[in-house]
């Protein structure tokens, strides 16, 4: 698949404006195709970014703690089914084996995956598996809680529904006590 030119993308926006009954040549919409293309470049900037590159700076220290938990990483993504936003928080825990990363690196991983067309279930797995693959901890737990515009703006019109997804690797997948501890900790905030 070849990537369309910027002009082709702008023409596609004009076509969508016509489809909804708007006139793309009216004053308020003249620059809209450019704005949409610029917005999409930022919103979907997660494509082509390498998680391994983000996680390449590791600290190999004796860990004086058992678990590492980072809560409330805020994100906004777009569902691949309707291209409508969903937003929420990500909680990440891992049990280090011999290395850790700075906490901003975990937030950057969330941003990489959130800035793509997504489904929440897949994003949860991608975050957990990328931490597992790159840090090789004893285990990883990821929980995402999100509100989906495709549920609130259309269809069933449920604006208070929150979807929760979890994915576990290593000792979190193998031992219930670790999962239980993680879920209890994330519920306390």
Curated annotation (Swiss-Prot):
GO terms for cellular component: cytoplasm. Zn(2+) binds at residues 79, 82, 150. GO terms for molecular function: GTP binding; GTP cyclohydrolase I activity; zinc ion binding. It catalyses: GTP + H2O = 7,8-dihydroneopterin 3'-triphosphate + formate + H(+). InterPro entries: GTP-CH-I_C/QueF (IPR043133), GTP-CH-I_N (IPR043134), GTP_CycHdrlase_I (IPR001474), GTP_CycHdrlase_I_CS (IPR018234), GTP_CycHdrlase_I_dom (IPR020602). Its EC number is 3.5.4.16. Gene3D superfamilies: 1.10.286.10, 3.30.1130.10. GO terms for biological process: one-carbon metabolic process; tetrahydrobiopterin biosynthetic process; tetrahydrofolate biosynthetic process. Transmembrane segments: none annotated. Pathway: Cofactor biosynthesis; 7,8-dihydroneopterin triphosphate biosynthesis; 7,8-dihydroneopterin triphosphate from GTP: step 1/1. It comes from the Bacteria. Homomer. Belongs to the GTP cyclohydrolase I family. This is GTP cyclohydrolase 1. It comes from Rickettsia peacockii (strain Rustic).
